[in-house]
């Protein structure tokens, strides 16, 4: 079952991030979470999600852009289903070059050639002590 997110929780999430990072900040969540966030309204009944077509800008939530990440957890108890912050502070390290191996024998009887590729990567927040990215965690139940 999906856990609900309120408009006030999103406001608190935005303000939990150091103001120095909010200029380039954006949200990140699963597409199912976006569906639920599009239904949220503020105290005046205005939607938090705003389509950008009228102003030729990307769609926003609370005035911030968002990114859909299908690998993020869906809204459920205990899940960290919404991230907010400056993702340019996330560094991706390529541990090694891509290694490609050609396997002539595997599918030879079918007249085909197989390829096998290896690649290693890692990632971490730079200067994580100043909290450039925060997560909204759903209540456990």
Regions from the PLM with identified roles:
Residues 1-141:
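Structured, hydrophobic secondary-structure cores that serve as assembly/anchoring elements
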């Amino acid at each position: 079952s999906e856990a609900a997110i309120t408009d006030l929780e999103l406001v608190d999430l935005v303000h939990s991030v150091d103001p120095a990072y909010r200029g380039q900040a954006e949200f990140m969540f699963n597409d199912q979470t976006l569906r639920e966030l599009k239904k949220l309204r503020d105290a005046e009944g205005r939607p938090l999600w705003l389509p950008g077509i009228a102003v030729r800008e990307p769609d926003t939530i609370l005035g911030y852009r968002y990114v859909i990440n299908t690998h993020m957890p869906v809204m459920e108890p205990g899940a960290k289903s919404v991230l907010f912050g400056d993702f340019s502070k996330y560094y991706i390290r390529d541990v090694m070059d891509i290694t490609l191996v050609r396997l002539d024998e595997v599918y030879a009887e079918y007249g085909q050639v197989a390829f096998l590729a290896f690649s290693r990567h890692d990632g971490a927040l730079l200067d994580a002590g100043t909290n450039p990215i925060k997560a909204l965690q759903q209540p456990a139940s």
